[in-house]
From Swiss-Prot:
Residues 571-898 are annotated as: Interaction with CCAR1. SMART domains: HOLI (SM00430), ZnF_C4 (SM00399). Residues 1-566 are annotated as: Interaction with ZNF318. This is Androgen receptor. Residues 1-537 are annotated as: Modulating. The modification Phosphotyrosine is found at residues 218, 262, 302, 341, 352, 357-358, 388, 514, 531, 895. There is a cross-link at residues 381, 500 (Glycyl lysine isopeptide (Lys-Gly) (interchain with G-Cter in SUMO)). Composed of three domains: a modulating N-terminal domain, a DNA-binding domain and a C-terminal ligand-binding domain. In the presence of bound steroid the ligand-binding domain interacts with the N-terminal modulating domain, and thereby activates AR transcription factor activity. Agonist binding is required for dimerization and binding to target DNA. The transcription factor activity of the complex formed by ligand-activated AR and DNA is modulated by interactions with coactivator and corepressor proteins. Residues 538-611 bind DNA. The gene is Ar. InterPro entries: Andrgn_rcpt, NHR-like_dom_sf, Nucl_hrmn_rcpt_lig-bd, Nuclear_hormone_rcpt_NR3, Znf_hrmn_rcpt, Znf_NHR/GATA. It comes from Mus musculus.
Length: 899
């Protein structure tokens, strides 16, 4: 069964009838307006081929005779209506009528044209139904579908039908266009600038030199049909999805790649058929709702694009039905550099890129070619409306999140060198140029072939290439969990994306205890450490700014005066609450009882001021004796020295320890952000880095420490830094928050919630217990300072240091200083021994806590790339190099008591 292309659908057609839809009723107003079309235009008759069989008199027209016969029979509309409700039009020429017309008018008989179908046994041409392999140009036009019931065209319906719908006419036009093709090549430079406003048929007539005839001439002349009727006809045709420019098709020779089957609408880039330069009869028909006639919705949105087709570099002007109406205002001029339309040998890559997979659902064969090479530095596609055309408009609602690269030719491409070409299937759109910064760092510039320019490295082993996020499998290999059991070597810690680079070589350029030490020699913008950690001294009682050391503690002036009056007075204070009132800068006067208790807990005593004065007096006397050099001594001086020795509980050693004690260090934690494991642990690591710098300065300022070998100095600090920080944190927690929380820093205090959130609750509980020991044992600040110095010399390698003998002597001197401080306030030897036992037992309890924290930090460093915890460079180096030695037993602490 033959299939005829209809309006918006495909339906079977009987051999002698064709159907039209209900749109015919919309032309009623046009029929009433068009009554006297007038004589045929002379140019229309001139261009009509002999095969059209035009009649000179209306009375002898076959259509006129059929109309009269149907009128005599009665109502012709009643019996020609099809089963589906469509109106059926009889064939224009039955075999008998064709023979009668041939006999009655022998001068009008003609030979069949090559493209026309011939009736069996007859030599007359017959208009066959459009086969599936014929182009849409041979389909019935809008006016030919009106049929014999069009009253306004009753006098010239046969002529119009023959002109608009006879295949011989199209064949003659094709022959004339092929004969004049060489003239078009000479006018190539003129055709690239002019705009075709009358459609493809008008361009063909201009090329052949024939006088131009508009559609108005075919519709009945220039005076009988009003302009409003013509505009109404056009509007109704467009609203029904019809193309009124049926004559504006090109010949098969000219329809190379932009024919009506594959051409896009509204001046867009033509969609290319799979086989280049295929002849026109091979073009399969499409339903009108999927073919070029589907242009009603795009016309309203892209009216600015509607205009004459641009001409390519080869001078061929390609067009299709429904796309040739244009005015001078809607013209788009395309420069010759934009080769959107090509004739002859078009690039297959560009052909596949311009193919519209949504508007033309055909089985297009052939794999897609890679995108055409672009500029080496091109990272952004310069969007041109002509690059999208109707393909973009038609597929905008279908592929909103789809592959946009296939619609506009895959123009989003990365650099031609330095990175792999982008595939058209990727929907990533690069919006960063080579000069702009990206989310993960500067983008690799186009044309660079270095591996570093392939893409910026993002966190956790991913890199961002120009077209998206791909896995970086070769740049990172996760470190396996390794617990040393034999020979300890350097442990490879994670890649630099988890370690901040702030420290260079280990304290190589340290110029002294108070010198200008930089964090990293490679960073010129780093200021001295004192700039980052200014000495912040706060009152240990209320937290206000401290004015100095008063009565043995660092306090402000207000707490100094309060303690003097409260300690010397005989008034006893009672707390109205539970002896746990908050004492700060604003509430320090609310409860004198809790404030005085806190003063005693901080180590304030009335005798500390007198002892300090006596110590200064001893220094003055020793200086005078050394300067005098007299062998004889004054008895009064002997009495003074002996009196000072009796009160010598504040030795010079303690003065040095108080002077070199580090100040308060902040962690830089943002307490406004919600607590998380990564944020808390990263802040602890940052605090450890800052405190480690102060530990180095403090250790090098200790008496006798610089006499050690340089390697021994570094080893002692790297082995004991964890115990020193834990011990100092316990003291801060005791003095500031009464051991209820862990006071790591003023901006980083761990309560119960943060202890659980940090996943180190057991370690935090042990550190809080250590802080409580300071209160239970009533540790004084002097004892704390001496114990902290002794803790530095409490862990050494099993094989010993390079100068082990001097280390043992230095450690013994610090033990004697601790015993002297204990004996200073106690006259009973038994009490001194008990106190010494308590303090040394407290020192031994620090080592297990430090070892447990060593294990935790080492495991955290191995998994830092998975848990997003940052480790400063110096911390990562110590943990990866020195901590495994402690965990493996190569380095062991020195205990006072048997464990």
């Amino acid at each position: 069964m033959e299939v005829q292309l209809g309006l918006g659908r495909v339906y079977p057609r009987p051999p002698s009838k064709t159907y039209r839809g209900a749109f015919q009723n919309l032309f009623q107003s046009v029929r009433e307006a068009i009554q006297n079309p007038g004589p045929r235009h002379p140019e229309a008759a001139n261009i009509a081929p002999p095969g059209a069989c035009l009649q000179q008199r209306q009375e002898t027209s076959p259509r006129r005779r059929r109309r009269q016969q149907h009128t005599e029979d009665g109502s012709p509309q009643a019996h020609i209506r099809g089963p589906t409700g469509y109106l059926a039009l009889e064939e224009e020429q039955q075999p008998s009528q064709q023979q009668a017309a041939s006999e009655g008018h022998p001068e009008s008989s003609c030979l069949p044209e090559p493209g026309a179908a011939t009736a069996p046994g007859k030599g007359l041409p017959q208009q066959p139904p459009a086969p599936p392999d014929q182009d849409d140009s041979a389909a019935p036009s809008t006016l030919s579908l009106l049929g014999p019931t069009f009253p306004g065209l009753s006098s010239c319906s046969a002529d119009i039908k023959d002109i608009l719908n006879e295949a011989g006419t199209m064949q003659l036009l094709q022959q004339q266009q092929q004969q004049q093709q060489h003239q078009q090549q000479h006018q190539q430079h003129q055709q690239q600038q002019e705009v075709i406003s009358e459609g493809s048929s008008a361009r063909a007539r201009e090329a052949t030199g024939a006088p131009s005839s508009s559609k108005d001439s075919y519709l009945g002349g220039n005076s009988t049909i009003s302009d409003s009727a013509k505009e109404l006809c056009k509007a109704v045709s467009v609203s029904m999805g019809l193309g009124v420019e049926a004559l504006e098709h090109l010949s098969p020779g000219e329809q190379l790649r932009g024919d009506c089957m594959y051409a896009s609408l509204l001046g867009g880039p033509p969609a290319v058929r799979p086989t280049p330069c295929a002849p026109l009869p091979e073009c399969k028909g499409l339903p009108l709702d999927e073919g070029p006639g589907k242009s009603t919705e795009e016309t309203a949105e892209y009216s600015s694009f509607k205009g004459g087709y641009a001409k390519g570099l080869e001078g061929e002007s390609l067009g299709c039905s429904g796309s040739s109406e244009a005015g001078s205002s809607g013209t788009l001029e395309i420069p010759s550099s934009l080769s959107l339309y090509k004739s002859g040998a078009l690039d297959e890559a560009a052909a596949y890129q311009n193919r519209d997979y949504y508007n033309f659902p055909l089985a297009l064969s052939g794999p897609p070619h890679p995108p055409p090479p672009t500029h080496p530095h091109a990272r952004i596609k310069l969007e041109n409306p002509l690059d999208y055309g109707s393909a973009w408009a038609a597929a905008a609602a279908q592929c909103r999140y789809g592959d946009l690269g296939s619609l506009h030719g895959g123009s989003v491409a990365g650099p031609s060198t330095g990175s792999p070409p982008a595939t058209t299937s990727s929907s990533w759109h690069t919006l960063f140029t080579a000069e702009e910064g990206q989310l993960y760092g500067p983008g690799g510039g186009g044309g660079s072939s270095s591996p570093s320019d392939a893409g910026p490295v993002a966190p956790y082993g991913y890199t961002r290439p120009p077209q998206g996020l791909t896995s970086q499998e070769s740049d990172y290999s996760a470190s396996e969990v390794w617990y040393p059991g034999g020979v300890v070597n350097r442990v490879p810690y994670p890649s630099p994306n988890c370690v901040k680079s702030e420290m260079g070589p280990w304290m190589e350029n340290y110029s002294g205890p108070y010198g200008d030490m930089r964090l990293d020699s490679t960073r010129d913008h780093v200021l001295p450490i004192d700039y980052y950690f200014p000495p912040q001294k706060t009152c240990l009682i209320c937290g206000d700014e401290a004015s100095g050391c008063h009565y043995g503690a660092l306090t402000c002036g207000s707490c100094k005066v309060f303690f003097k009056r409260a300690a010397e007075g005989k008034q006893k204070y009672l707390c109205a609450s539970r002896n746990d009132c908050t004492i700060d800068k604003f509430r320090r006067k609310n409860c004198p009882s809790c404030r005085l208790r806190k003063c005693y807990e901080a180590g304030m005593t009335l005798g500390a001021r007198k002892l300090k004065k006596l110590g200064n007096l001893k220094l003055q006397e020793e200086g005078e004796n050394s300067n005098a050099g007299s062998p004889t001594e004054d008895p009064s001086q002997k009495m003074t020295v002996s009196h000072i020795e009796g009160y010598e509980c504040q030795p010079i050693f303690l003065n040095v320890l108080e002077a070199i004690e580090p100040g308060v260090v902040c962690a830089g934690h943002d307490n406004n952000q919600p607590d998380s494991f990564a944020a808390l642990l990263s802040s602890l690591n940052e605090l450890g880095e800052r405190q480690l710098v102060h530990v180095v300065k403090w250790a090098k300022a200790l008496p006798g420490f610089r006499n050690l070998h340089v390697d021994d100095q570094m080893a002692v600090i790297q082995y004991s830094w964890m115990g020193l920080m834990v011990f100092a944190m316990g003291w801060r927690s005791f003095t500031n928050v009464n051991s209820r929380m862990l006071y790591f820093a003023p901006d980083l205090v761990f309560n119960e919630y943060r202890m659980h959130k940090s996943r180190m609750y057991s370690q935090c509980v042990r550190m809080r217990h250590l802080s409580q020991e300071f209160g239970w044992l009533q540790i004084t600040p002097q004892e704390f300072l001496c114990m902290k110095a002794l803790l530095l010399f409490s862990i050494i390698p099993v094989d010993g240091l390079k100068n082990q003998k001097f280390f043992d002597e230095l450690r013994m001197n610090y033990i004697k200083e601790l015993d002297r401080i204990i004996a200073c306030k106690r006259k009973n030897p038994t009490s001194c021994s008990r106190r010494f036992y308590q303090l040394t037992k407290l020192l031994d309890s620090v080592q297990p806590i430090a070892r447990e924290l060593h294990q935790f930090t080492f495991d955290l460093l191995i998994k830092s790339h998975m848990v997003s915890v940052d480790f400063p460079e110096m911390m990562a180096e110590i943990i990866s190099v020195q901590v495994p030695k402690i965990l493996s037993g190569k380095v062991k602490p020195i205990y006072f008591h048997t464990q």
